[in-house]
Amino acid sequence: MDKNEVLAKGGVEKIGLQDSFLKHQKGEGEKTKIEKTMNDHKEAIELVLSTLTDQKLGVISSLSDIDAAGHRVLHGGEFFKESVLINDEVIAKIEEIAPLGPLHQMANLKGIRAIKALLPTLPQVAVFDTAFHQTIPDYAYLYAIPYELYEKYHIRRYGFHGSSHRYVSKRACEILGLDYNKTKIITCHIGNGASLAAIENGKVVDTSMGLTPCEGVMMGTRCGDIDPAVFPYLFSNNALDPKDMDNFINKKSGVLGVSGVSSDMRDVEEAAFVRKEKRAALSLKMYDYRIKKYVGAYMAAMNGCDVLVFTGGIGEKGDTTRRGVAMHLENLGIEFDDTINTGLRDKEMVISKPTSKVKVIVVPTNEELVIAQDTLALTKK
């Protein structure tokens, strides 16, 4: 870990289906696809472990070379304010708060239990998506609903993409030579899911996602902020079945819902700029505008901003989105350099002019490194 070197990377897809497969890459070498039916997470991790020790594809000689396993866990609720070593008590608590994010949380637990079954003595660490945001003050995380609902059901803003916001905010300060604990930063993690965070003097003071990852800015298939009265109105007009509401707000809305084209920004940009489709163009304007509004709001919340960071798949690759968000904000101290921005992909780069009061920078995220570093730190103790 002293070198932060990636020995291998990959992932298993379609667990539980006949056409499940493992994507594997040894270092920077050729990518391999191993097709094998994996009925559950235990079988998936068995294949991962056998691949890591394989004579041709592997990077370790035996499983004893593995010192620990780190897990990205969606939700830590109010119980986990930082990464923790996993034990039976932690597993029970993760399961207890699973209703806050049932799909992801149960999958996270399956991975933890599979490792425990296969390598029972191996230390495991949980790194929570929500933990970095636990410094948000109560006036920012509470919803304006009866307080008893917060007390009974823990309904509040939690925020997500925590490892990404943590990594890129610190890395941006390293690149710019700024003291992280004396800097006001707005981080924009923009991918198919998107969230912003306001970080003041090393602590998150607000973030755009809420109880679930659906709140906040417009996303690929999620609606983001919406008047909740829309839903009883749709129900009363038989335009939406209450049973379909979750699917409606999470999978049918956002850029996909408005454009009618795709949730993939590349497809939508082609429709807007090449085929001149009005709905596609509208969805892009809405997307940029809503992110820009949050940038302005967080500047107000912190009484200023020193650094604006773009990351995530679109934030790292999408010069059109970065332009739409950061241009024409001169009165807020942002002098955007579109010459540097245009065509920039997957590189650490300052994209504001030297005279800009607010530095704008692209920082590719590295959530896996955060998980590895936290795992190392906790298992070294």
Which residues does each predicted region cover?
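Short glycine-rich, Thr/Ser-proximal phosphate-binding strand/loop in the N-terminal lobe
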Residues: 1-38, 210
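Phosphate/pyrophosphate-binding loops at sites that engage ATP/ADP/AMP, CoA/4′-phosphopantetheine
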Residues: 51-67, 172-179, 295-306
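Short beta-strand-loop/turn "lid" adjacent to the catalytic site in phosphate-handling enzymes
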Residues: 52, 56-104, 125, 131-142
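Glycine-rich beta-strand-to-loop/alpha-helix junction loops that act as flexible
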Residues: 71-74, 190, 309-317
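Glycine-rich phosphate-binding loop of actin/hexokinase-like ATP-binding domains
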Residues: 132-237
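Catalytic phosphate/nucleotide-handling subdomain of diverse soluble enzymes
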Residues: 200, 206-241, 247, 312-343
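Adenine-nucleotide phosphate-binding core of ATP-dependent small-molecule kinases
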Residues: 247, 254-258, 265-301
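Internal helix-turn-beta structural module
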Residues: 281, 285-309, 315-381
